[in-house]
Every structure is written in structure tokens, then in C-alpha cells.
């Protein structure tokens, strides 16, 4: 059988020579056709003479030059180019003089240009409103009209914002044009900054965001407005009013220290220094009532934690702890529902959480000093883990209804049977294995 297959390949090669012969024979037979083909190829290679059209260049030039060169002649043309990309080519350079001089170009009567001018004035009022809202009455009046076009075309203001920022920089000499938000913050500090800082801190505790640390950096640099932000924390919780009045001196350092070293690992060491006086204060306050001892640590720990790199976890935990300070177990349940494993390790990381977990169990351990804090959090962590497991089981059982054991049928009686496996039997009993089949 192996011998016959080779013969078919030899007959295969003959066909290719036939194709080669055919290819070679065709040009020999049709030399006239080759000449015609050569002539066609020459014509194709030469190509047709193209006329140099200058009108195309003239057409393209005025489309770009119309909005740029003619400031007042092509009012309708500019209006027609609004939805296209030409608006940004012509509108962007026109926004700069509009931001600098609104009264001079207002009588020109260009509805298409007035809308971007109003947009240029629009981003300022929200910044002033966020800082304190008593900034400019004229800007607030202008903001009412341009808000509608903004909603209709959200993409336009995004592209024109850098120019509008430069236009606003002309009016506000103290603000830096490239970053509008910090510029707006820099404008407000003289009068409305304390109000703005109070609102910012109350909002930061609820939802910490990246821009908010920037707002805190400004009051921290000025130094004077730092104490007023310390006062608003006691307002939300009545329990903090007493300790806050006495602990006004220690809190300012945590506000001023984090800006200097916010990201470094030495931040906990800096935070530990202000915590010590507060711990002493908490010890002195525990004599009248232990509830006050619970209250002071959360504010101190909440403020530096918000300034730390990981704002979300502290934001989730403080509200649950502040919601019901007296009963610790329910607060831990809330934490366990969100993420059971993280709470114990999170308490292990920082020095502040030990202060949180430290006061509740026994007041007698606290006077021992700074060395004992590590062991209590470990014990509290184990207790909390047990309580979280129990509470989780209770909640799990309460959600579902289980059948009693009596409802299920009785299991079948177990009968011991000796099972025989052929692989475990002796070869002698099985006999000799069969001979392998003979290959033919």
C-alpha cells in the first residue's frame, strides 16, 4: 500500500509546465496586443493633465477667514456656523474681548456672540455662591439668563472654559486664571470665607471629596480662620458642646499639621501628639459622666481621618458611631453589614481607633498611659468580632423561616454491606490475564 501513493505526484507536475507554456505562448501569438497594451500602459502612466484650480484655495480661505477677520460684517454667517466646528475657530478669539469689555461690544447687536459672553460670566456666579454669595449682584443677574443655553449645549462651555477663565482673570486681578476653583476660593477669604469653611467642613464629613482638602488647605495656610472651623463641629451633636469649649486649644494643631504632612507615614505621629491632651481631658470628664468620654474622641479622629488619603472608610464609620454612641453593639452591626472583615484591621492600623474603642469598656484601664492602648483594641476587636458574628446569625435567622426537624422524613437505616471490588481481588482467583490481540 505505501508504494502506490508516490506515483500520483509525478503526474501532478506536468500541468504546471502547461500553464507556463500557455503564458509564454500567448505573448508570442499576440504581439500586436502587446503593443496595444504597452500604449495603454504608457497613457495610464502619463496620466491626464490636471488644471491648477485656484478656486479651491480661495473657497477654503474665506471659510476660515470670515469669522476671524470680519468682526461685525458676517453676523448671520457666524450664527450659521454655531453648530459646526467653525464656531470654536471664530468664537474663541471673540470671547476674550467680550470677557474684557462687555459694555463696548454690547451695542454691536450680535445674538450669537452675546450667548458666549453670558457663558463667560456664568461660571463665576456659582463660584461666588459657593464662597458666600454676597460677591457680585450683577453676576448673579447675568447667571439667571445664561443657565438655559448652558443646559441646551453642555459641550460648548467645556471647550470655551479656558478662555472664559482668562476673561474672568481680567476682572478679578487677585485670582489665578488657569485654575478657576482655587481662584474663586482665593477671592472670598477676606469676608465670607469663615461661612464657606463652615459649610465645607459640614459637607466634608458627609461626603469627602478631592476638592474639599484644597479648601481646607487655604484656611490652614491663613492661620486666622482656622479656629472658627473648629467651633462648628460641636453644633451637630449636643454632647460635644461641653468638651469642645474646653478643648479649643488642642484641636487647631491637627488642622494645621495635616496640610504640612498629609500623605507621609509620619501623619499618625503628628496626630498622636494632639490626642494625648484630649485623652487627659477625656479622663477628667469621665468622672461626671462616661457619655462625654465617648463623645470627644470621635471628632478628633474624624477630622484628621478626613484629611488622610482614604476618606471613604472613615466617612462610613463615623456616622454609624455618631448615630448611637451609648450602645456599641448596634453600631458594630452596621459596620459588619457593610463589610465584616475590615473593621478589626482598620482599628489595628491607626492610633485613633484605639482611642475610640478604649473608653467604653472600663474607665480604670485608661489612666495607665499610652503603652496599654494596643492590648485593649485587640480584646475589643475579638469581642466585637464575636458580637458581630452573633448579630449576623440573629439577623440571618430572622430573615428566613426554617422548618423544624420533625417536618423532615427520617433517614433510611444504615445497613453494612461488604462490597467486592475486582481490582482488590487476588490475581490467582481472577486467573491469568487474556493474551493481547494479534495484529494482522
Swiss-Prot record:
Positions with biased composition (Pro residues): 1-18, 176-193, 225-236, 249-262, 356-378
PROSITE patterns to which the protein is assigned, alphabetical: WH2
Pfam families in the cross-refs: WH2
InterPro entries cross-referenced by the UniProt entry: WH2_dom (IPR003124)
Compositionally skewed regions (Low complexity) per UniProt: 116-132
Predominant place of localization: cytoplasm
Post-translational modification Asymmetric dimethylarginine, affected residues: 37
GO CC annotation terms, alphabetical: cytoplasm; cytoskeleton
Subcellular location: Cytoplasm, Cytoskeleton
Top-level taxon in the UniProt lineage: Eukaryota
Region (Disordered): 1-38, 56-386, 419-440
Residues covered by region (Binds actin): 49-52
Leader sequence segment: none
Nucleotide-binding among keywords: no
Location of the WH2 domain: 36-53
Any one Gene Ontology molecular-function term assigned to this protein's record: actin binding
Function comment: Plays an active role in the formation of cell surface protrusions downstream of activated PDGFB receptors. Plays an important role in actin-microspike formation through cooperation with WASL. May cooperate with WASP and WASL to induce mobilization and reorganization of the actin filament system.
Complex formation: Interacts with WASL and WASP, and this interaction results in cytoplasmic relocation of these two proteins along actin filaments. Interacts with NCK2 resulting in the localization to sites of focal adhesions.
Family: Belongs to the verprolin family.
Protein name: WAS/WASL-interacting protein family member 2
